[in-house]
Amino acid sequence: MSTTVGQVIRCKAAVAWEAGKPLVMEEVDVAPPQKMEVRLKILYTSLCHTDVYFWEAKGQNPVFPRILGHEAAGIVESVGEGVTELAPGDHVLPVFTGECKDCAHCKSEESNMCSLLRINTDRGVMINDGQSRFSINGKPIYHFVGTSTFSEYTVVHVGCVAKINPLAPLDKVCVLSCGISTGLGATLNVAKPTKGSSVAIFGLGAVGLAAAEGARIAGASRIIGVDLNASRFEQAKKFGVTEFVNPKDYSKPVQEVIAEMTDGGVDRSVECTGHIDAMISAFECVHDGWGVAVLVGVPHKEAVFKTHPMNFLNERTLKGTFFGNYKPRSDIPSVVEKYMNKELELEKFITHTLPFAEINKAFDLMLKGEGLRCIITMED
């Protein structure tokens, strides 16, 4: 790889030229990394709902043309000035949010919301110089959440790169750079269920099932899956879900249904849909005295959370979480180790595999609601 150090690399990338239109495979020029940046060779990437959301560009600032993608795994090709903890050949996961290690958030054991590198969906350039590292015929192609993994090579800030065990299979652990860690950490790091406890999971997509996986790992004895789509229930059993509730089957609020099932409420709940009614239900279904509800899903910008203050005074706790409260550089390597020592199972999240040339099929699968994670193989 050393022959490319300091040089512009021309490679294939799937470019989103405009909202909602199929990605186009293009030859792009990828500039060398600048100060505190790393250039990565992406080997595997997967598709997350966030990619689809910003590709559709409904309700946010459309930034096009851009290279989407943020769940991935690869190898360091070269490093920019000032980068000391990474070297060419290192196996890494790029992450959509970062850890500068210098700000108040990074120095706090309680936060992972880095002031410098926190996710910014509107920024299509590198923070170092306000320029893009991607171009076609000299014209810039914008970045996406600092990662842009739908390209054979990408440039990422060093603070958004987790160095991992080189023995870890990159085609499996790539899913840990976003959704799976988000759900897993919401349970293990924030809800913190104890062995033998009861947990309700609202929403049984990939993030919700990762939250269920966290409850399974923690030793919860009852894991109640809540979803409006009954076809998800069978698959959820693989992730430790023991019981299912479809709110459509009942005439009363689902929080009342769960309270009756569990002698007053579950010990913990994790909400992974982003629907405000589900968020309220997730809070109101936990037991008074000790119940903890954790919100993961991102709500509509106009949504308002309404509940009676007595629900708090009766000693219920409501928490929020971002990326499972994991610090990308410090914590994600240990999540990879959970997979390596067979504590965490990742294979069951991976339902499809496609070559890079067929990336638009991955969008079709997600739009149809088929499968959980589709791994896109960059090399033919």
Curated annotation (Swiss-Prot):
EC code: 1.1.1.1
Organism for this UniProt entry: Solanum tuberosum
Pfam families (UniProt xref): ADH_N, ADH_zinc_N
Reaction equation(s) it catalyzes: a primary alcohol + NAD(+) = an aldehyde + NADH + H(+); a secondary alcohol + NAD(+) = a ketone + NADH + H(+)
InterPro entries for this protein: ADH-like_C, ADH-like_N, ADH_Zn_CS, GroES-like_sf, NAD(P)-bd_dom_sf
GO process terms (BP): alkaloid metabolic process; formaldehyde catabolic process
Disulfide-linked positions: none
Binding site for Zn(2+) 1: 48, 50, 70, 178
Name of this chain's protein: Alcohol dehydrogenase 3
Residues bound to NAD(+): 50, 203-208, 227, 232, 273, 296-298, 323, 373
Localization (cell): Cytoplasm
Keywords: Cytoplasm, Metal-binding, NAD, Oxidoreductase, Zinc
Family note: Belongs to the zinc-containing alcohol dehydrogenase family.
Record SUPFAM superfamilies: GroES-like, NAD(P)-binding Rossmann-fold domains
GO molecular function: alcohol dehydrogenase (NAD+) activity; S-(hydroxymethyl)glutathione dehydrogenase [NAD(P)+] activity; zinc ion binding
GO CC, any one term: cytosol
Cofactor binding, note field: Binds 2 Zn(2+) ions per subunit.
Annotated binding of an alcohol, by residue: 50, 70
Cofactor requirement: Zn(2+)
Protein's UniProt keywords contain Metal-binding: yes
PROSITE patterns in alphabetical order: ADH_ZINC (PS00059)
